[in-house]
């Protein structure tokens, strides 16, 4: 990664908006592009050279012909550009379009001083601060996961992982009225999950955790389990924990393989649901979620780096220090 001058996009073209990025969150999926591991990214596109950054807070500089945003307005960017014609797009699930393009991956992203994006990708956030605005994108992934899992008020849910996505899932589930247990090995992250609405936080070996959750649910197991950690060993545990007729939502991505007993599916009639990215509707709901909980979310933003130290920020994030949660690059 280098700091370099690039061509100015000039005035907004038809259907597009020019924005001035303020803050960009670093995500685990960014590591693949940064390290050259593009095989883990979707689509046979030309990746390099590429300006990264898909968790973006920005100020509108030129709204072009867009009628939805105004000059000077702060916006979050929904980074997904679906094709619009495939089966998922035609059925309202553009988030899994096989030909999608992603800002910051297939197209240049927010780690630059001016960025041109389609008007359909910008969402006004009112007086939300830049860090929280950048967090709308990961929050939208949590919102989508819980939409897939059909979270219900009053029901018990277990969230595996208290990274940014897991914490956002804890927040969103609690905001929906669910009773949440969040599982993570790092005490500081468990503490933050508690502050974001978890009823219980825990970390224990497999059998001890199973016993603890069974006790919490009066022996039934939780109706909903959301896996955000990406650890291959968690899925078999989730299938064991979830109640009969329950739902398991898999958000965390892993290139490994997980061993489990297929008989658990007909025996318990479990719904196992994948969850990827977010729809535009999820993104709008995430704007509302983050806006309503901005004070609680402030502790998520653990480290800040200026744009001139972006490479250092990525290397720091990839070292996975235990005190780091969401690392933000300030752009302008």
Please provide the spans of the model-predicted regions.
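Rossmann-fold dehydrogenase core element
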Residues: 247, 260-299
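Residues in the short beta-alpha loop(s) of Rossmann-like NAD(P)-binding domains
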Residues: 37, 186, 254, 278
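Local beta-strand N-terminus motif with an aromatic residue
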Residues: 154, 221-222, 297, 310
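Glycine-rich beta-strand-centered segment in the early N-terminal region that forms part
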Residues: 9-24, 39-87, 126-128
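Mid-domain Rossmann-like dinucleotide-binding core that forms the NAD(H)/NADP(H) cofactor-binding site
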Residues: 128-207, 211
């Amino acid at each position: 990664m280098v700091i370099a001058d690039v061509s100015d996009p000039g005035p907004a073209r038809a259907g597009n908006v020019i924005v001035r990025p303020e803050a960009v969150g670093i995500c685990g999926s960014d590591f693949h592009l940064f390290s050259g591991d593009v095989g883990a990214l979707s689509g046979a596109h030309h990746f390099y050279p590429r300006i990264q950054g898909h968790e973006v807070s920005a100020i509108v500089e030129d709204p072009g012909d867009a009628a939805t945003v105004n000059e000077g307005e702060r916006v979050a960017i929904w980074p997904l550009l679906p094709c619009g014609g495939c089966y998922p797009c035609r059925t309202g699930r553009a988030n899994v379009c096989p030909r999608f393009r992603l800002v910051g991956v297939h197209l240049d992203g927010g780690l630059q001083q001016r960025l041109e994006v389609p008007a359909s990708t910008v969402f006004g956030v009112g007086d939300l601060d830049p860090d929280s605005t950048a967090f709308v994108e990961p929050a939208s992934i949590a919102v989508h996961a819980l939409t897939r899992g059909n979270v219900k008020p009053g029901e018990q849910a277990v969230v595996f992982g208290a990274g940014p996505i897991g914490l956002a899932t804890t927040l969103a589930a609690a905001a929906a009225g669910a009773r949440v247990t969040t599982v993570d090995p790092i005490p500081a992250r468990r503490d933050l999950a508690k502050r974001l609405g978890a009823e219980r936080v825990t970390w224990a070996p497999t059998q001890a955790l199973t016993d603890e959750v069974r006790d919490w649910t009066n022996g039934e197991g939780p109706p909903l389990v959301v896996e955000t950690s990406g650890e291959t060993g968690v899925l078999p545990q989730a299938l064991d924990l979830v109640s009969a007729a329950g739902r398991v939502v898999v958000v965390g991505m892993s290139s490994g393989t997980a061993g489990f007993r297929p008989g658990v599916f007909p025996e318990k009639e479990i719904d196992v649901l994948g969850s990827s990215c977010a729809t535009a509707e999820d993104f709008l709901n995430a704007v509302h979620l983050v806006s309503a909980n901005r004070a609680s979310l402030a502790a998520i933003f653990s480290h800040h780096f200026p744009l001139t130290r972006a490479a250092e920020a990525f290397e720091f994030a990839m070292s996975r220090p235990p005190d780091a949660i969401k690392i933000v690059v300030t752009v302008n």
